[in-house]
Amino acid sequence: MADNAEKDKKDNSFMMKLATLIVDKRKGFYLIFIVLCIFCVLSMNRVKVNNDLTTYLPDTTETRRGLDLMDSEFTTYGSARILICNVTFDEAQKLADQVEEMDGVSMLDFDDTEDHYHDMEALLSVTFDEEADTEATQQHLDEVLDALSDYDVYYSSDIGQEERDADDLNNDMIVILLLAAVVIVAVLLFTSTTYAEIPVYLTTFIVAAILNKGTNYWFGTISFVTNSIAVVLQLGLAVDYAIILAHRFMEEHEDKDAREAVIVALSKAIPEISSSSLTTISGMVAMMFMQFRIGYDMGIILAKSIIFSMVAVFFLMPGLLLTFSKAIDNTHHKSFVPKITAVGKFCVATRYIIPPILIVGVIIAFFLSNKANYVYDTNTLESSTMSDNKFSVSMVNKEFGMVNQLAVIVPNGDYEKEAQTLKALEKLDVVKSCQGLGNIEAMDGYMLTDKLNPRQFAELIDLDIEVADMLYSAYALDQSDYGALVSGVSEYEVPFIDMFLFIYDQKESGNITLDDDLEETLTDAYSQICIAKDQLLGEDNSRFVLELNVPYEGEETTAALDQIRNTVAKFYNIDDILLVGNATSDKDLGDSFATDNTIITVLTALFVMIILLFTFQSAGLPVLLVVTIQGSIWMNFSLPYLLNENVYFLGYLVVSAIQMGATIDYAIVITSRYMDLKTYMPIKEAAIEALNQAFPTIVTSGSMLVSAGFIISYVSSNAAVAAIGLALGRGTLTSILLVLLALPQTLLIGDITVSYTHLRAHETPEHLV
């Protein structure tokens, strides 16, 4: 025993010294981890979660520029679409009148058209007098819903939507983590050889997860997607590291006492785990290069999770293994993982059949995956589970349709041009309705931006003509329009909105006095005009709000956007026009998808091939392994095409990186075992035995990642998160099947090529033994 330990020290002196320090100072490390965990638990609430994917669009995209401009120049008041079921029209009208009189409600649309009433169901379109993100607006919405609580009511609103989405995600995560915990324990019970290993694994996993989640505040804000899946993915991606150390310990413990076994096992596991983690981290790093910046958000958090997992395995788990060593010795049981010799024999027998089929299959999968229907809007997706919030929104959309709103932003300063543009837009078949200052009626058929002379204005608001002339003269003087004063103001025309606001300001300043009736009319109209002005007229730009007759995304929508842009371009310079809405956001995401897809595919493959090149000292092996996993990625995303399902673009990008970066480890395990075994046995026997030796590791890690993906898919009520989970579950399962049923044949057939492409005489690295 002493001789073996001495040999290990000579072979790996630095690692042995480091491992000895970690094991002997384990109590100190326990204390450090306890302090860090307490700090991280307290820090979790400091993390802000962003539920808006548009904030991750590149700054150069039209949608991002438009959203930033609207935030700075325009006010968007809170609104809600409220569905009341099983009511007559008269009942609905009474309720609408009641709601319209409530505090905080500035406007309510309801009539007897199909857009607002049909089949005993009514839709109230309510606009409030404050912005959507204020507590007052949320309170007003709650009061409206309370007033309608005696009826069967559903609603869709931008007010408090982020909070409702966050609550849904938090509730989903509790269920996901509980189910994942059950699956993890079940898998560990099935694949372990001693029951006392399980608390060691679980403690290590939990600590690593707490450290990662508690340090997310370093980045200020993280996306809801990252927040939802990071913990579960961390467990699935990093479980290999704990398994490697535990297996090393069990091997060394056969002829060494517990302390020496842990030290030697750790000294050997550190380089092996570090090497294994590089491929996974490379996939995360590749995501960070995406134009769509959520890739950076997910990539850096998941890369951090891998690092913290290694920290927990290197500095916490050795002490736990030593602490639990007696229990581990006393709770040994027979391994439940079966030998898969039959699969190995199948691989040997089909070594000339499967590789050609694999090549053809990969080529077909490549073309099919490119033909899949990629979607960019979560409204196009459906989740298996629906929260009360999502169900309420779906009911409104089901009965009265989704609202596809588009904002058109143009330079302001010419009301006549705006009115002409709005009239042109109203004639388009793709436009259901459009609103701007130029087509909002003020009084008696006059629009807010129509120009009126003093007589017209006086007749409109029932004002003496002499008073009107005086007010117009004061306005001309205020605007330094001396030409109007010289030529006389009787023909001087001023836009109604400008003259109205000028008179109101003069009244408020005490410069003029109006009779009671006129003052009441002025006051009542002022708030409505201000609401319209705040939403549609900015410091430098005007905004038109359109409702489209097309889906959120697709060729029809793209054509509609082009038609709208070309129509507006008849009146404005095309470079000064901005279109902003779900439709443009989806288009921008689609435009960046092709580039991001290339970045993910090329960088992950390149990073992994470089790592494998140094690991195996062969130019041929990395190509075989990467092609196998890339083939599984294409096969994964060809399934939706065959099943006539939509593919969420973010799911494709994220899972492509994870699948290449993480599941390549399964191929590495089999390949490293095979390369070692074939040095002292025939290659056919080596392939069979390599599968038997690698299967426990693959089934443990793989089943956890597959389960994590499918649990996320079927539990999450957020369609985007669910789509990523489904793609992850399918992708990992595809990789496992391909690695077990096609990689051995590829290795056997490519053995000669691999031998010829060795950079030096083959010597299996010790950490891959």
Question: What are the functions of these language-model segments?
Answer:
Residues 64-67, 71, 92-96, 138-141, ...:
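Extracytoplasmic/secreted envelope proteins and their assembly/folding machinery
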